[in-house]
């Protein structure tokens, strides 16, 4: 990593946070470089917005992966029925920041949890995301949520006709966009929870002009004659003491996908905890300080390789704060870092899971400016000062533990140093 990359990361942190408060300067401190609002203070399942590793998420998949990586977006924040997380989902500038943040992590596109064209601010957020995807060369798609048909069913109207109306709107207003998610040239439409309704899927297909691909959830999608593809999700209801990460759910999905010619979209997640949701049922998949994130991403490698590629993968979710699945604010890897200088040598200690740190960066201070003085492998714990590329006569040094992709970065705090004399922070 070059000095320019380090500077770019911290400058992006400043850009992300500029709308909400004081700007952080290039320094040995945690600066929010995410699209999460600094007003959000975190919860049991979600870290406060922090300094997040922007290493590409793809690097956690199998070697040679060409998998398209998507994430699910919830468009409802700012609605009084949901938690206040410090931003509105129908804020144009906020949506722009979110797309930029997703791109910076190596995400290919976003799939919106869509409630139809008459869903008010949720629909407005969806439209904003489409326009921002077009502007930033990003992908965008919609997933029709079961909630879009709830009122129709309550009134006793025909849910198939209501779905047809929604999907015709999507065809005209979304699927014609150059940013829309496509496989083999055909737009992809996803469905979430619609299995609870009696829908004439053949009639749906006949009524849609652009002949979209239908993607259904879970491994049963591969046996569904009405579908063209299946996507994995997160299954906290299957978690158990013997399977705390719900990995058997993923194994079942990938195993079924292997014997099907339908398009497979795997999944990876940090964990699950719906204690902040008004509809919560106490379901939990423990994050295990980032281990669940690493394990679910690597699981695809048991079934796919550079010779047999997984077409796509979805991360549930970008911003479901209420079910504790969001990665927007960063994944807490429970790391703590301390450093000192003794006998002309910079030394540091790390507490927390070592496999959640990708590498270390040593920063050196000149006045108010910090520059990169060294980049070191994750197993390193010290370096002679003579080996630093920046050796001012009087300086402060700092060690940054750069997390694995989308995990929090951690800083030691400045270690004051003068030639021939050193102090602990």
Regions found by a protein language model. Give the residues of each.
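Hydrophobic h-region of N-terminal signal peptides that target proteins for export
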Residues: 10-18
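Bacterial N-terminal signal peptides that target proteins for export
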Residues: 1-6
